[in-house]
Amino acid sequence: RAQGLLQWVEVPFADVVTGKLARTTIAVSHRWFEKNHFDPEGQKIEKIQQVLRKEICDGVEFVWLDFLCLSQVWTDKGTFEKRSAEDEAFFQESLACMLPNLFLGARIMVLWDRDYNTKFWPNAEMYVSMQSPTAQGLLPSLNEHYRPVFACMLGFEGQDERIEKRMREDWQELHMDAAIAMLGQDDIKVTNKKDKEVNLEVLRQLPVNLQHY
């Protein structure tokens, strides 16, 4: 933000449900490598650049990455810096909006590694990215509307197709209630327990909100 590189984009919910957002925007789903930095050695940035050069990302104009697009309490040097009141309010508002808007409508770059599978945010993001919004609630996406782009890392480098197949089998066909129950288990870890509680409720309300749209 200090460099003036962030761009504020207001996204109508119509762009989420019609697929327009997916044509221009990709969001990165990942787990942080360290508590105070998402990518201390630059491995993820390199992987993101590789994926963006692929044909599957043609048309992408905007990339959303939490560390860069949400005000963090950790600087890019890994030091703690308290958010301003304004930044804290925006951060909390964003947490409640990400799943039912960004991750429901954009293309999703899944930076998968072994620990990704144990984290609440990545798994919730991946589940939502495999669904399509309908008047009946969330339904598994047909192939032509499927939005995840898998890019495996670390010990799973080069195993994109195998891991994607496995994750689709585990998550894509799950009914919302079953997904919420799985995400609510204690072995799905989250740094802030309140984040899990708030966003499980966000998922519960999604079908109702879609009916009202």
Named regions from a protein language model:
Residues R1-Y213:
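The feature represents the membrane-entry module of six-transmembrane cation channels
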